[in-house]
């Protein structure tokens, strides 16, 4: 009796902790669900390994027909390459300009009203959920063939990413500087400019540079729908079955994207990791890079022959196209629409599963602190870079030519493309782990494999799961546009409805795509919040 009276009470947090599933338990549940979803999805699209084995001869034959690569008109290809680069820079810059005020309205700690925050968040979510190629198709239909639809498509889709990241950065700022500035009696805008902006500029710059890198890859494929860039020449070569010319253009694209990635690394180092020994040099470099950005945007308007007024006048003809999509017509396609939508999700699931299986080994070998030998590290890094340089839509064209029309070609394209995305994230996550556990395992005689399974994977597992879920989100979004080249999914129905001017049917398909992408994004985000 006395023992019970003197026993200290249990902490109040204990019951809630006991009800919360452990991290290993959640990982097991997610793994089981992923395996079941992969099996069901593979069955739904008739994806079997024997299909790849049977089609391997066709793939090899197609690659042999591409060799040796050639450039029939180097001057024209060079101009299209410059056009592609300028489209990416201008589109990203316009998106950043639009995202800054939108982010302040969407951030919880800077929005003037909850209703304004909800509207701003809805705009950002819509731009992120709609694929850029879909925006490009609609703008080409509204404004005609040219680079302006491509620039606008890149800008609108980029708002979805930049706006969200910018708003998240604002919400994570320290409130202390704002209170100090507010105490001096300055207004609302001066408060934001003096107290919030200095805290978020580094993360904004990093994301802006990263988005240019992404948009350069995206601008390559916009030419497939007549939205300018080097993709138009690539599509022309593939349509004419001139495969050596197509491979030559792909090599040019590889050089451009690889160069841009190296330049982005250098820019981030200059802007975000200033040298303590020579601050004057860093200041000059920053002003110089700012001048290069402004000069590139001016050059984009001149060389791309874009009237600056078109940035404001595009709204009216585009609204005319969008209004023709309302009310949406779900009856025209009937059950075929939802069958194609289910196929889109299945393609994303299977491609993600294969991509994870291929990306984790490549990412581990590409991690400098874990790779067993430089002879494995550098080829792994090069392989990741090469795969990242080739957009999934181009891979889909190759697999359609080798394996035929259908979801299998789209699944293979997304699976290979996933390596460039996920393997890099895996390598970055592994390089950031604590070296202490690795040294402890090695100190007791543990070899490379023992170190990998006992020290590396346990530390990096949450990041691997989070990146894999994000890859699934990206793959489902990308699979919605692969239908443009006959690689399965709902994209084929969408582009056919737009081509035949059935905009009410296109409106129904757009709504279905939005619901799918938004639901997947929310689901993966919820799982990441539980695991990471």
UniProtKB/Swiss-Prot annotation:
Region (Disordered): 1-20
Keyword annotations: Cell membrane, Membrane, Phosphate transport, Repeat, Transmembrane, Transmembrane helix, Transport
ABC transmembrane type-1 domain mapped to chain residues: 81-264, 341-524
SUPFAM superfamilies: MetI-like (SSF161098)
Cellular compartment(s): Cell membrane
PROSITE patterns, sorted: ABC_TM1
Complexes and interactors: The complex is composed of two ATP-binding proteins (PhnC), two transmembrane proteins (PhnE) and a solute-binding protein (PhnD).
Protein's recorded name: Phosphate-import permease protein PhnE
Gene: phnE
